Amino acid sequence: VDNSEDSLKSAIEIALAGNLFDAGAAQAVQNVVGGSSFKGDSNKFAFKNSEDLQFAFEASRKRVRNSEWLCDDLDELRANEYDRVCVFCDNAGADVLGMTLLARELAKRTKGAKVALVANELAALNDVTINELEEFYQVCEQHDPEYLQLYRENGKIALLSSGQASTLLNLNATGKDINDWVKREDTVGGVDMEGKKLKWLVVLDGMGRSLESNWECGKYVQPHVDVLNLAMVKSEINAKRLGANVYDCVCKLSNSR
């Protein structure tokens, strides 16, 4: 990402490529990575080694580059700077790696920005839990002390529980950890140096959180909040409902303004 000419675009592409790896859409995964020594049936999948996983991820990223984008608001996203960001993670593995890189990029883009990486409290299919996210992030820190480790230590990135245990996301029933963080940041530090209201971004990752349960939530947020729905369409049901094709990508930025 750091060596890319467009680091935000690279972070978004990696996030979308990672979102393919979903136990709830295993057939879609197999269709993309069939060239690897991939094993399993249509209900489960596994990789024999790290080389297989790397091959599969590159195949997925190529698919992102070559696929149609049902919504492409990347330019609008790039034109904004966000002071506070909540990233609601989806799947464990490659997907949460993509979300971590996106959180890192968003924390770097705006001076004084803070980002919350949010995960389920309890397990649901292969969705990452807060305990798994913390373990994963600790490994990432070892490889990136300049940013990920420093950002965790100085509070630019926080790891928080959503208080939920579902593949969907009910934004009216989030837990104490994320609620307290948002309340604190939006009141104590809720204005910038010029006294203007801080600008917030809510990132909803994956089919369950962004396509199935919160597709229109941008209409209902406060005026200083934007919502980014970010996902790869991996099922015929969702494709038909949205007027899309399987493997189409969604990068939809919305608000109530």
Predicted regions mapped to residue ranges:
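Residues at the starts of beta-strands that form the adenosine-phosphate
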Residues: 83-84, 112-116, 226
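Gly/Ser/Thr-rich loops at beta-strand to alpha-helix junctions
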Residues: 88-100, 121-125, 207-212
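Histidine-anchored nucleotide/phosphate-binding helix
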Residues: 93-112, 116
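Electropositive, gly/pro-rich neighborhoods at or near active sites that engage anionic ligands
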Residues: 1-82, 96
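Structural motif
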Residues: 84-86, 200-201
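C-terminal functional extensions of proteins
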Residues: 119-121, 128-257
